Design a protein with these regions (language model features):
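WD40-repeat beta-propellers
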Residues: 43-47, 94-98, 142-146, 193-197, ...
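Short loop/turn segments immediately following beta-strands, especially the blade-tip
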Residues: 47-52, 99-105, 146-152, 197-200, ...
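Conserved strand-to-loop turn within each blade of WD40 beta-propeller repeats
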Residues: 37-38, 88-91, 136-139, 187-190, ...
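Canonical WD40 repeat/beta-propeller blade segments in eukaryotic WD-repeat proteins
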Residues: 15-26, 65-78, 113-127, 164-176, ...
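Short coil/turn segments that connect the beta-strands within blades of beta-propeller domains
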Residues: 30-32, 82-84, 130-131, 181-182, ...
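Beta-propeller domains
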Residues: 1-2, 29-63, 100-101
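Terminal intrinsically disordered, low-complexity extensions flanking WD-repeat/beta-propeller proteins
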Residues: 2-20, 29-31, 272, 278-358, ...
């Protein structure tokens, strides 16, 4: 169970962008950084554990060619082996800062030469993989930047061509020294997922076709892709093969954010945030899904949600036209939550899961289980 905590005020409301919240925890200093996009600026806040704001900074998108001010599309902290960089994307280019936003160390201007007169030019989708930072583009390409241990000598090392429509999000997980491991996934507006192996030269391993709706947010968990779609579904795929494990009708409207820490958080425009436990069956290795918590944010078009700590004991939410960051924290330890809540599980070979907030009819026979509808495949 989670309870509402003290909110963190914003100078301006959050823009209606998917994944419009980034969180960086600094355990040594007992601080948490939050980043939110508002039009042509990004707001950076530092807060104590009780939610008291301690410092604020506002970053502007770097001006480029054009008459209108550039709009920011995303802000995200990238944790690299030897440093942390803050990456800001806009309709003009890609800006990289030191983690506190005090010094810009790199600027990459977007080349609109390949864009048609009616096509918007922007960068969107940011993730770190080893000493690389990957950034998605409106053209479907993914730029890979090689980041040095210190200093501004950042190099564009590669451009990945796997998508034909704008990139929406990128997710990574540590390869941990394994060869031929799928450790990067990119998503686009058509719902297509591209799975890559990182390295000096990135390699495309597989493509997972879309089905007519965008995929605004993706995550990677132990070689499994969690993908959130515009129809409210969360789908779990085997990263190396593209095999579908589980399909969850998690929300009634488009999903806007996913996060892992280590449970899966899903947030959508239906005002709900859900938390799911993912595990593998010890008997057959099947993916199992267990609903842990659902939180309604009334009268709010949720646009961003993130866990605030690695254990997943707290999370934060942003909403369109909402001038504050909402905070929620667990009132029970993880062990107490497991003992005190009824739960249900499903093996991917057998079932499709429907959340109680996803009000859709199903032509398949159903049965009720702890207020959730489980449809048999």
């Amino acid at each position: 169970m989670f309870r509402r905590e003290r909110s963190i005020p914003l100078r301006g409301s959050a823009a209606a962008l998917c994944n419009n919240l980034s969180v960086l925890q600094l355990p040594v200093r007992n601080l948490t950084h939050f980043g939110v996009v508002h039009g042509p600026s990004a707001q950076l806040l530092s807060a104590a554990p009780e939610g008291v704001p301690l410092a604020q900074r506002q970053l502007q998108a770097k001006e480029g060619a054009g008459v209108s001010p550039p709009l920011i599309t995303q802000v995200h902290w990238c944790v690299l082996p030897f440093r942390v960089l803050l990456v800001l994307t806009s309709h003009r280019g890609i800006q990289m800062y030191e983690s506190d936003g005090s010094v810009m160390v790199y600027w990459h201007a977007l080349d609109a030469g390949d864009a048609s007169l009616v096509q918007a030019v922007f960068a969107r989708g940011i993730a770190a993989s080893g000493h690389f930072i990957c950034v998605g583009m409106w053209s479907g390409r993914v730029l890979v930047f090689d980041i040095p241990a210190k200093g501004p000598n950042i190099v564009l090392s590669e451009e990945l061509a796997g998508h034909q429509t704008p990139v929406t999000d990128i997710a990574t997980e540590p390869a941990e020294g394994q060869d031929c491991v799928a450790d990067v996934v990119t998503a686009d507006d058509s719902g297509l997922l591209c799975v890559w192996r990182s390295g000096p030269k990135f390699k495309l391993l597989t493509r997972i076709p879309g089905f007519g709706v965008p995929c605004p947010s993706v995550q990677l968990w132990q070689g499994t892709i969690a993908a959130g779609y515009g129809n409210g579904q969360v789908r779990l795929y085997e990263a190396s093969t593209g095999t579908l494990h589980v399909q969850i009708d998690a929300h009634a409207r488009a999903i806007c954010a996913l996060d892992l820490a280590p449970e899966l958080l899903s947030a959508a425009e239906d005002t709900f945030v859900h938390i799911w436990k993912l595990s593998r069956s010890p008997e057959g290795g099947y993916i199992e899904v267990e609903h842990r918590h659902g939180e309604c944010v009334p009268d709010t078009q949720v646009c961003g949600a993130r866990f605030c700590d690695p254990s997943g004991s707290s999370f934060a939410v942003t909403g369109y036209d909402l001038a504050e960051i909402l905070r929620f924290s667990s009132i029970l330890s993880p062990g107490q939550q497991r003992k005190g809540r009824p739960s249900w599980r499903t093996c991917y070979k057998q079932r499709r899961i429907q959340s109680p907030t996803a009000h859709r009819s199903s032509p398949l026979p159903t049965r009720s289980c702890c207020q959730h509808t489980v449809s048999h495949w």
